[in-house]
Regions:
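Cytosolic juxtamembrane helix and N-cap/initiation of the first transmembrane helix
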Residues: 1-22, 129-138
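Short juxtamembrane and helix-loop transition motifs at transmembrane-helix boundaries
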Residues: 7-13, 29-42
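Alpha-helical transmembrane segments of multi-pass integral membrane proteins
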Residues: 14-27, 79-83, 119-123
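Transmembrane alpha-helical segments of multi-pass membrane proteins
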Residues: 19, 72-86, 149-150
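Core segments of alpha-helical transmembrane spans in multipass integral membrane proteins
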Residues: 21-23, 42-64, 75, 82, ...
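C-terminal TM-helix exit segments that contain a strictly Trp-centered aromatic cap at the helix terminus
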Residues: 24-35, 78-95
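Individual transmembrane alpha-helices with interfacial aromatic-anchor signatures
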Residues: 102-123
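Short, highly charged, low-complexity non-transmembrane loops/tails of multi-pass membrane proteins
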Residues: 139-150
Length: 150
């Protein structure tokens, strides 16, 4: 199951961060269903669906210890955090592409909406950071890496 790009023990933080992020994503999706499908613009719903597919691919890569798992974690983690800040935290300046919790119309936004959005942003940042560390660890332990001294 493992391509042995680094030990299973070293891979554990990436797996844990990915599962945590996937859980935060799922809770946020539940909040969208709770708020009602009409609460968000169609572009947000389409974007969330595309994000769900990308998250699923990243989960599979991480759980299979694929060599590109750290890069997937970096892209999904930091990308999701940035998109969530834009879509839910910033004031509305492109209403067709935002579901802002800070400016109108805020349809059915509750404390649970805020908790799930902040959890996904935080989990995304953590996933991206853990992905960076995993990639750095893989690069420094790579047997192909040759250093020459001049």
């Amino acid at each position: 199951m493992s391509n042995n790009w680094f030990s299973s023990t070293a891979h554990r933080p990436l797996t844990t961060a990915m599962i945590g992020f996937a859980a935060a994503y799922a809770l946020h999706a539940i909040d969208h269903f709770r708020r009602g499908m009409a609460a968000s613009p169609p572009s947000i719903m389409v974007g969330g669906t595309i994000q769900g597919i990308v998250v699923l691919i990243a989960v599979v890569l991480v759980l299979r210890h694929h060599p590109r798992a750290p890069e997937a974690a970096i892209a999904v983690g930091f990308g999701s955090a940035a998109l969530f800040v834009y879509a839910h935290v910033l004031p509305t300046f492109l209403p067709d592409f935002q579901d802002s919790f800070t400016s109108g119309p805020r349809i059915n936004v509750t404390w649970f909406s805020w908790v799930t959005a902040v959890a996904e942003i935080g989990a995304g940042l953590l996933l991206g950071y853990v992905g960076l560390r995993a990639r750095r660890r893989r690069t420094t332990r790579s047997p192909e890496r040759v250093t020459s001294r001049a």
